[in-house]
């Protein structure tokens, strides 16, 4: 198993698909990386040489923000919004939808499981 950016990449899959297992790399970035390194798109991970794996690793480290760094930046952006006290920050703090979705019904993913209210018997 090749290890790139702290993630074990599945060996049986094509390189483009396997790279998407890294947080922050989707299909578009994976295709860009493969083109930059010059690896055929049909190549499987177990067919890669050590030099090619090293090239992929260096390209990702140099050009992309992935895994821990990306997660840290995202959480810092959310924390900044919460510290500012802006509307989006308040929504994050209260655990409600941030992007204008309705909350009268739905929004259960963001709000958590429904809480029973006492005194609602017939």
Swiss-Prot record:
Keywords, alphabetical: Ribonucleoprotein, Ribosomal protein, RNA-binding, rRNA-binding, tRNA-binding
Keyword Cytoplasm: no
Any GO BP: translation
Transmembrane segment boundaries: none
Chaperone recorded as keyword: no
One GO term describing the cellular component: cytosol
Protein name: Small ribosomal subunit protein uS13
Gene that this sequence comes from: rpsM
């Amino acid at each position: 198993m090749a290890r790139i950016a702290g993630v074990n990449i599945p060996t049986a899959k094509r390189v483009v698909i396997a790279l998407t297992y890294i947080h922050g790399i989707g299909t578009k970035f994976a295709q860009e990386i493969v083109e930059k390194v010059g690896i055929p798109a049909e190549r499987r991970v177990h067919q890669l040489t050590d030099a090619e794996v090293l090239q992929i690793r260096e390209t990702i480290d140099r050009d992309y923000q992935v895994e821990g760094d990306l997660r840290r930046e995202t959480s810092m952006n959310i924390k900044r919004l919460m510290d500012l006290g802006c509307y989006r920050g308040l929504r994050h703090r209260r655990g409600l939808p941030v992007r204008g979705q309705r909350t009268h019904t739905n929004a259960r993913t963001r709000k958590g499981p429904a809480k029973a209210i006492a005194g609602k018997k017939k």
